[in-house]
Amino acid sequence: MSPDNYLYLSALLFTIGAAGVLLRRNAIVMFMCIELMLNAANLAFVTFSRIHGHLDGQVVAFFTMVVAACEVVIGLAIITMIFRTRRSASVDAANLLKH
């Protein structure tokens, strides 16, 4: 498979993730779409790394995956606490800063 196809796939995945963030109001779905966007960026980094023959893109993708794993833990903990207090995972219902 040519590197162009990987870049097209990366752009498609990023677009799907961005549309999900903009159109969905559920915090868990938005969170999954953000992760999809991060993985699309990682795919682009690895593809450009492969095209140019350097390991820099793969190293950046590795560190991005480490940061994304930390983000998942913290984000899901916050979403779980919001769900426990409000009984809803909707972003519109999460106005906890007002109290």
From Swiss-Prot:
Signal peptide: none annotated. Keywords: Cell membrane, Membrane, NAD, Quinone, Translocase, Transmembrane, Transmembrane helix, Transport. One of its GO terms (biological process) is ATP synthesis coupled electron transport. It is a multi-pass membrane protein. It holds the Pfam family Oxidored_q2. NDH-1 is composed of 14 different subunits. Subunits NuoA, H, J, K, L, M, N constitute the membrane sector of the complex. The chain crosses the membrane at residues 3-23, 28-48, 59-79. Gene3D superfamilies: 1.10.287.3510. It comes from Mycolicibacterium vanbaalenii (strain DSM 7251 / JCM 13017 / BCRC 16820 / KCTC 9966 / NRRL B-24157 / PYR-1). Belongs to the complex I subunit 4L family. This is NADH-quinone oxidoreductase subunit K. It catalyses: a quinone + NADH + 5 H(+)(in) = a quinol + NAD(+) + 4 H(+)(out). InterPro entries: NADH_UbQ_OxRdtase_chain4L/K, NUOK/Mnh_C1-like. The keyword Transport applies. One of its GO terms (cellular component) is plasma membrane. NDH-1 shuttles electrons from NADH, via FMN and iron-sulfur (Fe-S) centers, to quinones in the respiratory chain. The immediate electron acceptor for the enzyme in this species is believed to be a menaquinone. Couples the redox reaction to proton translocation (for every two electrons transferred, four hydrogen ions are translocated across the cytoplasmic membrane), and thus conserves the redox energy in a proton gradient. Its EC number is 7.1.1.-. It is found in: Cell membrane. One of its GO terms (molecular function) is quinone binding.
